[in-house]
């Protein structure tokens, strides 16, 4: 059952799956389906589920021409050494490592908030070294929106989407295909299953050779100082009543032997530290190629709505480069004018303005005239810091501030039913956006300038957004404040004043026409 411990002294059966059918082919098909739909996770352990699935897919098994020595022969020959979906697995591991680092960052953020001054890492993305079958990878991972990531590795850019679909199980979409993902980090190693195929991916730790599963070290045929070639045997291990060996993933010199013979080791336990020769650690001929899942639809990515969504993600504190966005604002403006109707373009821009206003409203450093009902006369930033120290004390905060906070959190899908983890992640992104705000002001100015020169027709909602922007940026972002006033005048005030003026002129013309029609003295004097 879930939560049970499996003793390391002997091999314990987790489950036995038996399939029946009217024919051998039907029984095998049912067994394959049962294994494919079964999720087994052993913390600090491993199962032979994938190995059994590989056996069932082997043509020799399908034809029934195997003998009793077939499995042993495969193991000795290193059969099934190549695992499909390794490219997807490395991307998934990079994303999991990114989220682990973000969890640490959010912990630091909360600790600093408890001390009265929250601090965030305003850097964009994370670079975390990974190692898979002897090859090192340094993917740069960025979270570009909720559930969406961009991974750059070996000169290839990959867009990935991850959705939760059950306990421990997720779905990952890369290269236009969606696959089942199971990801678990244990003992410094990522266990990643893609459509049931397991991969163990470690952090690049400079030549540390680790145990692939719980096992007994039955032999170490090398000594410290020995030089080994790629593929040479470094250690013999026994697991699941089967003996195998750990091979050198690259040529090098044995720097240190960590494990000892006849001892039990867990998954990921260090066995040997191998010093690579020169750059051989990165020159593995078996390196994974990522071209098959690379993002290729450049035209779709350049679409106006996609670019505007990137701007929204930037303002929400996700890992979007403001310099790249700022440099392409002219192209975005011209493309949007061609691709979108004025109403749709204004709708998206208004949402971007709302995000900007809601975030800056939480960081005002001085009280305003709107805080007249607040006897303490504290700023919104002080209230935010109080909330970050203890999110359960919302009752002690002014209603106006909590309304601002709830409206801002709603941009991240956070409401009263959201988990603490979801809320913490949103608060971290809010603080990150504010930390980067100086680099984002130019984008807001460009969008406002477009509305100034193409005011079009706008509803009262946009009037409210502009009013809030004018109020919240006063004495803080003077360029935004002044331009927002100009836009408000151009979109709402000037058309109104022009209509009033035109109506006055029309009335004057009407009165003059009446005077011309009544030239006799008594009527003329009464009209005047």
What are these regions (language model features)?
Residues 4-5, 194-219, 233-251:
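Short beta-strand-turn/beta-hairpin segments enriched in glycine/proline and small hydrophobics
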Residues 210-227, 250, 256-263:
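Short histidine-centered loop motifs in beta-beta connectors
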């Amino acid at each position: 059952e879930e939560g049970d411990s499996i003793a390391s002294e002997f091999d314990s059966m987790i489950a036995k799956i038996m399939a029946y059918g009217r024919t051998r082919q039907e029984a095998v098909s049912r067994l394959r389906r049962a294994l494919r739909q079964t999720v087994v996770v052993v913390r600090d352990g491993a199962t032979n589920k994938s190995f059994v699935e590989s056996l069932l897919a082997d043509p020799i098994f399908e034809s029934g021409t195997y003998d009793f020595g077939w499995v042993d022969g495969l193991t000795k020959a290193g059969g099934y050494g190549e695992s499909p979906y390794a490219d997807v697995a490395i991307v998934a591991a990079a994303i999991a490592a990114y989220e682990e680092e973000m969890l640490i960052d959010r912990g630091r953020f909360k600790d600093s908030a408890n001390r009265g001054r929250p601090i965030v890492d305003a850097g964009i993305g994370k670079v975390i070294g990974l190692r898979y079958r002897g090859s090192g990878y340094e993917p740069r991972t960025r979270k570009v929106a909720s559930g969406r990531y961009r991974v750059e590795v070996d000169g290839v850019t990959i867009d990935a989407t991850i959705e939760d679909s059950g306990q421990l199980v997720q779905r990952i979409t890369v290269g236009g295909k969606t696959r089942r993902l199971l990801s678990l980090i244990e003992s410094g190693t990522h266990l990643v299953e893609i459509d049931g195929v397991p991969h163990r991916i470690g952090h690049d730790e400079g030549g540390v050779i680790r145990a692939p599963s719980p096992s007994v070290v039955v032999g170490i045929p090398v000594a410290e100082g020995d030089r080994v070639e790629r593929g040479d045997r470094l250690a013999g291990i026994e697991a699941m009543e089967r003996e195998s060996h750990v091979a050198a993933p690259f040529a090098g010199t044995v720097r240190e032997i960590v494990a000892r013979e006849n001892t039990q080791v867990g998954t990921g336990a260090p066995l040997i530290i191998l010093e690579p020769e020169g750059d051989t650690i990165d020159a593995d001929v078996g390196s994974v190629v990522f071209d098959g899942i690379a993002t290729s639809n450049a035209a779709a990515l350049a679409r106006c709505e996609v670019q505007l969504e990137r701007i929204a993600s930037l303002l929400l504190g996700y890992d979007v480069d403001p310099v790249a966005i700022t440099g392409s604002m002219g192209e975005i403006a011209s493309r949007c004018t061609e691709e979108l109707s004025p109403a749709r373009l204004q709708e998206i821009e208004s949402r971007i303005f709302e995000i900007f206003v809601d975030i800056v409203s939480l960081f005002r450093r001085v009280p305003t005239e709107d805080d007249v009902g607040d006897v303490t006369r504290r700023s919104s930033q002080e209230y935010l810091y109080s909330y970050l120290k203890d999110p359960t004390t919302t009752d002690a905060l002014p209603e106006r501030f909590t309304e601002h906070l709830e409206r801002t959190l709603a941009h991240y899908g956070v409401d009263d039913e959201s988990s603490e983890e979801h809320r913490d992640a949103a608060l971290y992104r809010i603080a990150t956006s504010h930390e980067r705000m100086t680099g984002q002001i130019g984008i807001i100015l460009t969008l406002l300038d477009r509305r100034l020169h193409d005011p079009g027709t706008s509803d009262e909602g946009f009037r409210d957004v502009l009013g809030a922007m004018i109020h919240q940026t006063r004495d803080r972002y003077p360029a935004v404040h002044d331009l927002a006033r100009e836009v408000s005048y151009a979109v709402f005030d000037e058309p109104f004043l022009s209509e009033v003026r035109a109506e006055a002129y029309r009335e004057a013309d009407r009165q003059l026409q009446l005077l011309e029609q009544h030239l006799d003295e008594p009527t003329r004097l009464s009209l005047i």
